[in-house]
């Protein structure tokens, strides 16, 4: 099968030509500010016009809540599309291709499960993306668990500190408000008095204790989330992805915090097989649906 894979993130949109499960070509562009799905669908198709005639289907993975009506942002600070945003319908109308759409972390969870399960005999696992926001996907009893309203896996909006910072979802102390790329960036700006990218912050953290402490706070929040998920779902494995999650040294911080906790709560964490493109590949692999509930 030949799939046009589209990954909609808060910062960028990635496009891939996936042939028989392999990413053949890839490109990306910054997520634009748009008021209607038609405009974005046209822009996406213009970027991948050279692939379009050759693909069989279109797969979308996106941050936010996915429904038959479209995309709805749980945190408008990470995705500012009008709600609901019927991107899938417009891509189908303009291209004539069959289109499927799935939450990005759910899509990545399914992709990672398909890659890891034969080797590790995984039955229950979570995928956590630490990027602009924090998202998650759950595979339970070897099936992708989406829930009745497709809301399952929005673990970035579980609360760690009820007195913590206000999240864009309007709860206080969400994992996303503490650990996300946006949260780290806001903390760095408050600390250093100027805008500093997360890439620069990770470099600075190698010799600056304040920068290192910001990253450590994020890593410990994600580690605590992993511990909570182990206690709730008895997971075999947690896979970490996203621009922050895959940054040098971040995963080691997460695992080190987990390893200090009581053994019964500990869970193995590992980096995404799909690296920075786990969500993009997941967009294509949602068509591999033998246990995609």
Curated annotation (Swiss-Prot):
One annotated GO biological process: N-acetylneuraminate catabolic process
Keyword set includes Phosphoprotein: no
InterPro entries: ATPase_NBD, ManNAc_kinase_bac, ROK, ROK_cs
Pathway(s) this gene product operates in, as recorded in its UniProt entry: Amino-sugar metabolism; N-acetylneuraminate degradation; D-fructose 6-phosphate from N-acetylneuraminate: step 2/5
Subunit structure: Homodimer.
Family, as annotated: Belongs to the ROK (NagC/XylR) family. NanK subfamily.
Entry protein name: N-acetylmannosamine kinase
The encoding gene: nanK
């Amino acid at each position: 099968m030949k799939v046009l894979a589209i990954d909609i993130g808060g910062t960028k949109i990635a496009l891939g030509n996936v042939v028989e499960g392999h990413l053949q070509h890839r490109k990306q562009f910054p997520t634009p500010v748009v008021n209607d799905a038609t405009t974005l669908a046209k822009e996406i198709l213009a970027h991948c016009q050279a692939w379009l005639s050759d693909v069989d289907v279109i797969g979308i993975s996106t941050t936010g809540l996915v429904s038959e009506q479209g995309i709805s942002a749980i945190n408008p600070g990470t995705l500012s599309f009008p709600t609901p945003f019927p991107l899938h319908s417009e891509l189908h109308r303009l291209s004539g291709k069959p289109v499927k759409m799935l939450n990005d972390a759910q899509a990545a969870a399914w992709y990672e499960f398909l890659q890891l399960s034969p080797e590790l005999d995984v039955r229950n696992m979570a995928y956590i993306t630490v990027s602009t926001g924090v998202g998650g996907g759950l595979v339970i009893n070897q099936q992708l668990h989406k829930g009745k309203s497709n809301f399952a896996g929005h673990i970035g909006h579980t609360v760690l500190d009820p007195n913590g910072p206000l999240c864009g979802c309007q709860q206080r102390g969400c994992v996303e408000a503490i650990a996300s790329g946006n949260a780290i960036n806001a903390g760095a700006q408050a600390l250093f008095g100027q805008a500093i990218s997360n890439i620069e912050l990770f470099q600075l953290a190698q010799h600056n204790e304040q920068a290192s402490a910001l990253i450590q706070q994020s890593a410990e929040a994600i580690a605590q989330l992993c511990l909570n998920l182990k206690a709730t779902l008895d997971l075999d494995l947690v896979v970490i992805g996203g621009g922050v999650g895959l940054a040098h040294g971040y995963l080691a911080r997460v695992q080190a915090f987990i390893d200090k906790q009581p053994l019964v709560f500990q869970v193995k964490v590992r980096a995404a097989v799909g690296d920075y493109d786990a969500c993009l590949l997941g967009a294509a692999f949602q068509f591999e649906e033998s246990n995609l509930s």
